[in-house]
Amino acid sequence: SALKNVIYLCKLIKNVYFCNSLTTVLINRFMINRVLIRLKIIQIVYAYYQNGSKNLDSAEKELFFSLSKAYDLYNYLLMLMVALTTYAQKRIDAAKAKLASTAEELYPNMKFVENKFVSQLEVNKQLLDFVANQKRSWTNDEDFIKGLYEKIIASDIYKEYMASPDKSYETDRELWRKLYKAFIFNNEALDTLLEDQSLYWNDDKEIVDTFVLKTIKRFEEKNGANQTLLPEFKDEEDQEFARRLFRRAILNCDYYRHLISENTRNWDLDRVAFMDVIIMQCALAEILSFPNIPVSVSLNEYVEIAKVYSTIKSGSFVNGTLDGIVNQLKKEGKLTKN
């Protein structure tokens, strides 16, 4: 499909450092923020033009479905830590049940399976609500869980934790922050597994990983099962931002492309990378449709996206073209904000 093609394209050319550093700066108290919204809109707008039907309502539904799938992945990755702990407990139970169990098997070190952070996560009300409404679970991927668990228990991170007498909540939480960064964050086997489960997750993992790490850091023992997870959207304003930006980018396409063409006269627009055109089209939709967002903020966001999601020279090309358009619109009195 067109969407699959663009997600594959983005996966090939994206820069992990960019995704991690950008989201680290901008995520605070909510999962889906405007960084992710902009990226998703560019993908969906790209797919819209690659798809012959060009149905605006269907494309908008696809946008919000895609955003909701990113939030599903966030919850699913939180569940992975619980699944690994559950598997560890099963291993302990199986070893105890053997006819000739060793002393170590009969009286194992329970520190990992009794980890206070995971115990809190396991009973988290919001996560349990998610689990109750999902057919998907990690129980169908026991081979993957087994392999990941064995890598964890062979690691120095695990061994040092198990040998330490420190049983504080903070130490338990820090263990999972370290394990997540070491074994889940950049895990090709997990990436493949998730890609097989959902097309949308292929391009979301690295960004969502950052949200999960942020969540681990925010957990506090005193909050118990009521610890809040990151909400899907900050508020209705961000949902409206996504809807309005997407529709303006499509409905005002001819005007935006006219502006782009006027400011790339030394270029044949057909020879400009199509992804660059889409990025600039979305950037102009934002600059001209949202008076409260400073021009510099929009320019910086889309130039950074171009550096990662298009060609090597796209960042400077998009920056120069958009800067020229902004100056032109200001001279004509069509753009008054700074």
Give the positions of each predicted feature:
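Hydrophobic alpha-helical membrane-insertion segments
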Residues: 1-6
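Class I Rossmann-like S-adenosyl-L-methionine
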Residues: 24-338
